[in-house]
């Protein structure tokens, strides 16, 4: 699945520019790849395993 990975507080993982950081973060979660979605200033992962939680507007717990 694809989506925004979360940190321990349930927030999207922030990024500013460049994809290397997000690609590394996503691959640690067993995704196929990741990039920095600049408009949202957050990492976005593609090809995540189904059991990895991703950020969802409906269940957002980020302060």
From Swiss-Prot:
- The protein's predominant localisation is secreted
One GO process term, biological-process aspect: defense response
| Keywords, ordered alphabetically | Amidation, Disulfide bond, Ion channel impairing toxin, Neurotoxin, Secreted, Toxin, Voltage-gated sodium channel impairing toxin
- This protein's superkingdom? Eukaryota
GO-annotated cellular components: extracellular region
Query: InterPro entries given for it?
Result: LCN-type_CS_alpha_beta_dom (IPR044062), Scorpion_toxin-like (IPR003614), Scorpion_toxin-like_sf (IPR036574), Scorpion_toxinL (IPR018218), Scorpion_toxinL/defensin (IPR002061)
Question: Glycine amide occurs at which residues?
Answer: 63
Q: What is known of its domains?
A: Has the structural arrangement of an alpha-helix connected to antiparallel beta-sheets by disulfide bonds (CS-alpha/beta).
Protein known as: Ct-IT1
